[in-house]
Regions:
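Short loop/turn segments that flank or connect secondary-structure elements
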Residues: 1-302
Length: 302
């Protein structure tokens, strides 16, 4: 199995024996909130797609989340988030990066046919509602997909408009189509935004979902993996940084099939990704150090 994958996350106990020939091991350490986070990646001497970096990004994201949760618990904060809690999944508008879209489509098509069809249909129905909402609020354009000759709605939303869309979405009370009996059917493959969404509080975050203005206590994260993946795709493809609402992923993909098949050397993708993550973590650490320095200085003055 290892030999067929261009980029593979390795456990600490795994050596180079499982990777076959023509490979390179890339290891790096990160300082996350003062704690070491290590990742070791096996990279084959072959071409890779953007989707191939996503498993490594997921593992790294989970390790950073674990470190963040431990740090919060060390200072006495309560983090009620756990596997099986779907409180946020029933209202939160999740955005994902281009590499995650491509990987999600691959993994969804490997599900049982009926389940795959249900998910795609559910997403498409909500995507149409989102598009109708956006048509009323935001300038948009139609793109023709040369492969299917279908019309694909392309849009970019940021800042205030994204907040308005999120508030509108909350009021629709739409559960994530990947939920089944309250459980995430793609939990191990869930988007970085989902795995990094933590809530700090003294009780589980069940609340009245009619209250779109409610603001939960969300801790500052050392890094948002979606930002790293957005920058990676933008860097490699020469495009603007893009994020796509999860529920629009399949519709968006149909207009970008050719992009999903573009390849680069696996080593290029892995090294670019690692470089981006390192830079983001370093910037986060510098900002944290400046905040500590500022608080300390203000305390001395008082």
């Amino acid at each position: 199995m290892f030999e067929s994958l261009p980029i593979t996350v390795l456990d600490e106990c795994e050596g180079q024996t499982n990777l076959g020939d023509n490979h390179e091991i890339v290891s790096f350490n990160l300082d996350v909130l003062g704690k070491p986070v290590h990742l070791q990646v096996g990279v084959k001497d072959k071409q890779a797609r953007l989707a191939d970096i996503v498993p490594a990004a997921r593992v790294l994201s989970s390790r950073i989340v674990e470190t963040t949760m431990k740090r919060l618990q060390d200072i006495g904060a309560s983090v009620p988030c756990h596997k099986g809690c779907a409180a946020c999944c029933t209202y939160h508008l999740v955005s994902i990066s281009v590499p995650e879209v491509f990987r999600l489509v691959q993994e969804t098509t490997m599900m049982p046919l009926e389940r795959c069809g249900d998910i795609v249909d559910s997403c498409s129905k909500v995507a149409k509602r989102i598009n109708r909402y956006l048509v009323k609020r935001i300038a948009f354009k139609k793109l023709t997909n040369t492969e299917t000759n279908s019309q694909v709605l392309a849009f970019e939303i940021h800042g205030e408009e994204l907040e308005k869309l999120s508030d509108w979405y909350i009021k629709q009370k739409l559960p994530c189509p990947f939920l089944c009996n309250g459980l995430c059917t793609i939990y191990e493959q869930r988007p970085a935004t989902c795995r990094e969404h933590l809530v700090v509080g003294t009780a589980p975050c069940q609340f009245d979902k009619d209250d779109a203005e409610r603001k939960m206590k969300v801790p500052i994260r050392p890094i948002r993996m979606i930002d790293a993946l957005k920058l990676l795709a933008s860097d490699l493809e020469g495009t603007t940084q893009e994020s796509i609402p999860l529920l629009c992923a399949f519709d968006w993909y149909r207009g970008n099939i050719q992009r999903s098949n573009r390849t680069w050397s696996a080593l290029t993708i892995a090294e670019r990704f690692i470089g981006i993550v390192r830079a983001m973590i370093s910037q986060s650490n510098r900002m944290r150090a400046e905040q500590v320095k500022y608080v300390s200085k203000e305390g001395t003055r008082s």
